Amino acid sequence: MTKWFDTNYHYLVPELSADQEFSLSWEQLFEEVDEALALGHTVKPVVIGPLTWLWLGKVKGEEFNKLDLLDKLLPIYGQIFQRLAAQGVEWVQIDEPILSLDLPQEWKNAFERAYNLLQREPVKKLVATYFAGLEDNLGLAAGLPVDGLHIDLVRAPEQFPTILDRLPAYKVLSLGVVNGRNVWRTDLEKVLDILQQA
């Protein structure tokens, strides 16, 4: 187990091999969506994005480029999105926190390629970043062919004016304004002042 970025939460690290095969076997997601919908809730499932998942994975055995697995992994995401759409889900949040890291150009290119392929899938997609600002990846994130972008204003409030300038008007902008990492109450008046700028 490894720490999830700079949090006190841990996750099981995926172990990846050059001949890795992927299949969709996680029914719990779809069962929980059905249950929530049956209770009358609007559902927005959250999944770890394909690039973040590969980035965090560990090579097992002989070294290889983890991005070589992307073309095998993307159809699984397509299956997930198709099944969620068939259940009546309108939006899916795709967490890509590695967009807040200093990424090699090869990974930036992979983001563009992956999301160009995923844009064909039937649900609306909100790419979410957190733990830091987008920095040099702001243009990349704003330009991805998705329906919305979530940014962290608690850790990186300085990115707000720039993202307002760069994000196309037809995209939804979601703002992380409540600090979930401490016990202190959020200053709602201050948050409202920030939100009114959008």
Task: List where the protein language model places each region.
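Domain-level signal for soluble alpha/beta catalytic cores
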Residues: 1-198
